[in-house]
Amino acid sequence: MSDIALTVSILALVAVVGLFIGNVKFRGIGLGIGGVLFGGIIVGHFVSQAGMTLSSDMLHVIQEFGLILFVYTIGIQVGPGFFASLRVSGLRLNLFAVLIVIIGGLVTAILHKLFDIPLPVVLGIFSGAVTNTPALGAGQQILRDLGTPMEMVDQMGMSYAMAYPFGICGILFTMWMLRVIFRVNVETEAQQHESSRTNGGALIKTINIRVENPNLHDLAIKDVPILNGDKIICSRLKREETLKVPSPDTIIQLGDLLHLVGQPADLHNAQLVIGQEVDTSLSTKDTDLRVERVVVTNENVLGKRIRDLHFKERYDVVISRLNRAGVELVASGDISLQFGDILNLVGRPSAIDAVANVLGNAQQKLQQVQMLPVFIGIGLGVLLGSIPVFVPGFPAALKLGLAGGLLIMALILGRIGSIGKLYWFMPPSANLALRELGIVLFLSVVGLKSGGDFVNTLVNGEGLSWIGYGALITAVPLITVGILARMLAKMNYLTMCGMLAGSMTDPPALAFANNLHPTSGAAALSYATVYPLVMFLRIITPQLLAVLFWSIG
């Protein structure tokens, strides 16, 4: 058997063994995709004992290609929500998550200096302790750029594997410990979270209001500032027994009922100006109007603002709200459409069908992947990561590297959505498939390279010390920030658990947090809020630590 055939066969075996290990769960908790790393270590140990020779060049290419696929698809997935997560609504959660990353970096730096841990080893421990595989790839990339010998770079994968198990268990232990310390009643926390969402959350809501302000009588909707802005959409108007879709030129009269869509605070302001909320239904049932959700798939409307499409004027159809990457938004006129946006339309059936034709609404296109934008994005990301930045006093030019360059480019492209007829939307199933393939390839090679010396390092070397260092890097930031968030910020426990899981980009921890109260979405919401920014920081941090430690010797 040729070296290439043998290498591919061994990688396939690693994937099978690793995925099997990852699917084994104890009380609902398993290693998940991280099991591939340990599958690689097991197979790598026996490959080394048998004296088999694998193609090192091929292993290197597969490892890098796997990292490229994984990081790029993560960036495309979280791109639409990344910049939104930096806004005020998620600012507090992101600040605490960033603090966890910073404290973890400081603990790593202190351990490196106190115990004189080799740079590749301490970076591997850091990456494993925070259960972040892209950080491992980014760290190995920067070490190679700094001229570190390959045998030293491979040690990073071994130390990563030592620290990884407690990285998963440590966050679960932290959640349990915080629950005990603060005597948390999970049911009460879930009720409080639901109450805060209902009363003050930045969710999109609807209300029906009666026009009671005499100053608004006989005014066109476009002449009422609060109805002509970008924060509230008036999608239906009922006068006596007639329900219709209002246009900007529609005249409102005293006693009219308006169906408004917006955030709670803005709707409250509308009540102060227009009139009181009423219980009267403005349902389209048994009327000539209907409400329908339509998906944007037509390349000709991508990048165009809603107001420039003139749906109200041409078709008498109102877009009441927009769902982008799972986030509900008010469909203001200045929003530019992206591929995959889901629009809530209100109008007559024939008019809605006409608008749907303009927007595309081709469900099958959501299952198709445009490969040209994928490779354009990967190429641009690699180029961005290769741009050197020379800083006086540093031993090597700073680069974002494969991981950093691809992540930033994918975040930007995911946020832009489309350029002309090129769109960077990727169906969730396709994104997940490429992401899983990439991480399996990457971890398989890392495990294989680490497996030869893993057992000896654990039994006769410093493996146990590495596990202890990793436990500190995992536990200290989580416990510190968890206590601060609960005591100072009075953060909801379920929200805090989601934030802690997101700060470690740890899906098993999110599964554990969700199971604390299966019907509450608090943990998932906070996890999604901090995940994009934290993923970016986790990939950048080992590169910054590597350059810093290298420069100060």
UniProtKB/Swiss-Prot annotation:
GO molecular function annotations of the record: monoatomic cation transmembrane transporter activity
GO process annotations (BP): potassium ion transport
Compartments in which it is found: Cell membrane
Coiled-coil residue spans: none
GO cellular component, one term: plasma membrane
Membrane topology: Multi-pass membrane protein
Residue intervals passing through the bilayer: 4-24, 28-48, 65-85, 95-115, 158-178, 371-391, 393-413, 431-448, 464-484, 493-513, 533-553
Alphabetically ordered keywords of this record: Cell membrane, Membrane, Repeat, Transmembrane, Transmembrane helix, Transport
UniProt xrefs under InterPro entries: AAE_transporter (IPR050144), RCK_C (IPR006037), RCK_C_sf (IPR036721), Transpt_YidE_put (IPR023018), YidE_YbjL (IPR006512)
Main location: membrane
Signal peptide boundaries: none
Gene3D superfamilies: Regulator of K+ conductance, C-terminal domain
Domain RCK C-terminal, chain residue ranges per copy: 191-276, 279-361
UniProt record similarity statement: Belongs to the AAE transporter (TC 2.A.81) family. YidE subfamily.
HAMAP family reported for this sequence: YidE
Name of the molecule in the record: Putative transport protein YidE
